[in-house]
Amino acid sequence: MPIRVQDELPAVNFLRNENVFVMTTTRATTQEIRPLKVLILNLMPKKIETENQFLRLLSNSPLQVDIQLLRIDARESRNTPAEHLNNFYCNFDEICDQNFDGLIVTGAPLGLVEFNDVAYWPQIKQVLEWAKDHVTSTLFVCWAVQAALNILYGIPKQTRAEKISGVYEHHILHPHALLTRGFDDSFLAPHSRYADFPAGLIRDYTDLEILAETEEGDAYLFASKDKRIAFVTGHPEYDANTLASEYFRDVEAGLNPEIPHNYFPQNDPQNKPRATWRSHGNLLFANWLNYYVYQITPYDLRHMNPTLE
């Protein structure tokens, strides 16, 4: 949350030069507060597990957040009870005339599927186009990053020959960026993807600012300068055992997967993994909620015109 000081305090300019968020008394006394409305487009098969992961991160904030779950795939789910979907999810036509402070688009196990072969690809494009006028800030995660880069920037699908799976080290590029506020200079985060995100490609074909990279030079965290869209190519929401579940699933399927990198103690799948990215995930989502959503969203969502001033 921002600190509140008198307007004329010399520290105001000093801290703002470091991009520390300072709220003057004038702004604080005129700012109105209400619950934030956040829409989650859940594309993962195990929807309840994914809900738990994202809601855990979103709850770690002093801000009150009202969550709406969205589905766009009308096919019968093999992993989530129909009763759960009917009770807790809405369809797009039920919310398309509403505005939201935030939108999160989750990953999906579609790394080897061409975009046009995705059953709900037209609906994905519809939601992203709608969000331009109805959402203050959208956060894309893993596969959703690849989809958004294609829809919003025309970047073709980039696929790795081998799946990247494990916990990788990253470093921040802009220490004073709001989205990386409080991050360590280097931090760990999980990845589980075929998608490839070369930092050079992002720089050459978009106006997005890369805020953190992997040690191998892949873009991990990047965003638009107006804070309307943000992208995270990994899975900071994952539980300690999620990568293990994926690994053993693929073993049972006879896929001969590589052991996830830097994940099992002593690189032994029989050892219980430990989450080494939990603080990073909590801080990332808290920063997004505060700086990219709360601080720029209009109080009256009927007038969607996000601004920093």
From Swiss-Prot:
Name recorded for this polypeptide: Homoserine O-succinyltransferase
One Gene Ontology MF term: homoserine O-acetyltransferase activity
Main location: cytoplasm
Cellular compartments annotated: Cytoplasm
Signal sequence interval, chain numbering: none
Reaction(s) this enzyme catalyzes, per UniProt: L-homoserine + succinyl-CoA = O-succinyl-L-homoserine + CoA
Stated role: Transfers a succinyl group from succinyl-CoA to L-homoserine, forming succinyl-L-homoserine.
Site, as annotated: Important for substrate specificity: 192
HAMAP family: MetA_acyltransf (MF_00295)
Recorded metabolic or biological pathway in which this protein acts: Amino-acid biosynthesis; L-methionine biosynthesis via de novo pathway; O-succinyl-L-homoserine from L-homoserine: step 1/1
GO CC annotation, single: cytoplasm
Binding positions (substrate): 163, 192, 249
Site note Important for acyl-CoA specificity, residues: 111
GO biological process, one term: L-methionine biosynthetic process from homoserine via O-succinyl-L-homoserine and cystathionine
UniProt family annotation: Belongs to the MetA family.
InterPro entries documented for this protein: Class_I_gatase-like, HST_MetA, MetA_family
Enzyme Commission number, as recorded: 2.3.1.46
Active site: 142 (acyl-thioester intermediate), 235 (proton acceptor), 237
